[in-house]
């Protein structure tokens, strides 16, 4: 299969791939973008991989379509990153110490395949508002949200896992629908955590999860088995108007 490769290349000036169609497999390896990088409304027809790549200023992937599998491995985003309304039709992997040093926006982003954030650092605020996760979704391997993390109004259709994940800033999980199992395992919420008005349709677990400040589960709906086994609440959680199909496990 034909491919387009940018290896060991440095873009000193702003790069604009907006509205461009990459017709084949696309590789960016050990590539450096010293100024703004624009991939707005771009289409990657095949697999797209970004390995050991650095984006020094702002980066735009808004309204971008990734039709194949996509990898961001050991990538550094030093400036603000915009993935708003992007569509990932294949698997999306953000792995191996990929770092968002500034704010990262995934508002209204659509993940149609399985999604993995493994050993990723979000140093600024991160937004996944109204994002759609159609496949299985996993945040794991010490993925850390240092700023405010917002998932309000997102929809998770497959199995969702937050394993060994740390939220240092406020964590907002309001008005979310988890259609499949939702598992928060050995996850730490160092600041306020809000799950208000969220619908949990599948098996839900917060096992060995630590809530170090206030946590609220106001008006949530748990429609299957719900477990807080071995969870640690440093303050009394707020379950006002919460509804469980059966008593949750503590």
Residue ranges of predicted features:
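N-terminal leader/targeting and pre-domain segments
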Residues: 1-250
């Amino acid at each position: 299969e034909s491919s387009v490769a940018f290896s060991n290349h440095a873009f000193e000036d702003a790069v604009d791939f907006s509205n461009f169609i990459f017709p084949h497999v696309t590789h960016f390896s050990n590539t450096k973008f010293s100024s703004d990088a624009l991939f707005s409304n771009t289409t990657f027809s095949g697999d797209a991989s970004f390995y050991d790549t650095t984006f020094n200023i702002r980066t735009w992937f808004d309204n971008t379509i990734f039709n194949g599998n996509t990898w961001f491995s050991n990538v550094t985003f030093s400036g603000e990153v915009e993935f708003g309304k992007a569509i990932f039709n294949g698997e999306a992997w953000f792995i191996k110490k990929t770092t968002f040093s500034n704010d990262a926006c995934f508002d209204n982003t659509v993940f149609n395949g399985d999604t993995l954030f493994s050993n990723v650092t979000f140093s600024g605020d991160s937004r996944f508002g109204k994002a759609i996760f159609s496949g299985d979704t996993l945040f794991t391997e010490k993925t850390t949200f240092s700023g405010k993390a917002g998932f309000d109004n997102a929809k998770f259709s497959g199995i969702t896992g937050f394993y060994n994940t740390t939220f240092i800033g406020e964590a907002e999980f309001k008005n979310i629908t988890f259609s499949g199992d939702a598992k928060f395992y050995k996850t730490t919420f160092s600041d306020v955590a809000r799950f208000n008005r969220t619908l949990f349709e599948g098996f839900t677990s917060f096992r060995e999860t630590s809530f170090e400040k206030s946590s609220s589960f106001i008006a949530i709906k748990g429609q299957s088995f719900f477990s807080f086994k071995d969870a640690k609440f440093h303050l009394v959680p707020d379950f006002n108007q919460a509804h469980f199909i059966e008593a949750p496990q503590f």
